[in-house]
Amino acid sequence: METKQILETIQMISEEKLDIRTITMGISLFDCIDSDGVKARQKIYDKLTTSAKDLVKVADRIESEYGIPIVNKRISVTPISMIAAACHDDNYVAYAQTMEKAAETLGVDLIGGFSALVQKGYQSGDRKLIASMPEALSETQRVCGSVNVGSTRAGINMDAVKQMGQVVKDLSEIDPVSCMSLVIFSNAVEDNPFMAGAFHGVGEADKVINVGISGPGVVKRALEQVKGESIDTVSETIKKTAFKVTRMGQFVGNVAAKALNVPFGIVDLSLAPTPSQGDSVAEILEEIGLESVGAPGTTAALALLNDAVKKGGVMACEHVGGLSGAFIPVSEDSGMIKAVEHGNLNLEKLEAMTAVCSVGLDMVAVPGDTPAETISGMIADEAAIGVINNKTTAVRVIPAKGKQVGEQIDFGGIFGYAPVMPVNTNSPAKFVQRGGRIPAPIHSFKN
């Protein structure tokens, strides 16, 4: 990088809220499998606390040495449904508690991998883990869970879609805020550093470092310099900015991996917003030319942003992965919150936006009396977008117990707050209750 670019990067950190959103260490737990659940959990605790013992210390040192803010230090593990399947426990709440205890000991912010992959069907461990989710996630503060219900190669497991609607509903009855720790995927990726969907894939190395970047404020500031210019210029400006942001992510990842003696995995090219003013994906879209997010043209502007971020990021880093695109979580983005409060953005428009960006209906609050079948319908719609378009999509929806449209639910910190949004009241119950599996699309047959 030239001196001018280095100075620009320093300015991004000091003035434009550029940071590393997360350094996530992925850890395989296959060598912790045991038919005795107590022994398995002790092995898990020992491996986590040994493998990641220096993670927080190294991240803090990088932060102070290079002046680059690192917001979260996280861990992802092999899906627990696979690790716990060998034991004879009736439920896996104790595994979540072991993960929580390890995270507390290490001082990490979150730990992901209380997960199951059921896109084509269940094995015994999947059933036990999913049934344990409401209790496990409500009793822990740092544990995150995910379930993959569909893929382009397998289609959509509608039995799992039906069950996950009920799981979300059951969890919200215990503690609505805990729903932010649960995400339901199609085409889940194995190297995702972001929560709540991170897990350590079966094809990954024993340990790996993955980095998630941020930087919506940086992109917005860059676009302020090209007001009124053509869309080509907008795209080029975003690409150049994404290059610098990603370069910093790779640098931090390499330094951390070397210090921890762990392979460097990927940089996730996702623009991750926070509730802070000036750190919003919605504000980027408005800078491109929309009066408000949700206006006609929103999906096109988001597609432009997403594509330009990827093109710039790929040039800056030899290994990219994860979700890689723009995140549009309602509660974590001040511009999204404002658009919902003013009635400019609804669930249907959000769903359309998810067809061209990372993830899906994310951190969306709905009325507490929303039926489980309606939540299942939302999950099925998002899964269909992912399966047909060969991309990752997800649902992280929060039924706000005791609240109605227009009220708010507060998650605190970087998770912000969400206005409760109206949901179409027509029932998909008969569709959801059919069960079975939606077949894989015709274009999935690539061989």
Curated annotation (Swiss-Prot):
Homodimer. CDD domains: RNR_PFL_like_DUF711. Gene3D superfamilies: 3.20.70.20. Signal peptide: none annotated. SUPFAM superfamilies: PFL-like glycyl radical enzymes. This is UPF0210 protein lhv_0606. It comes from the Bacteria. Belongs to the UPF0210 family.
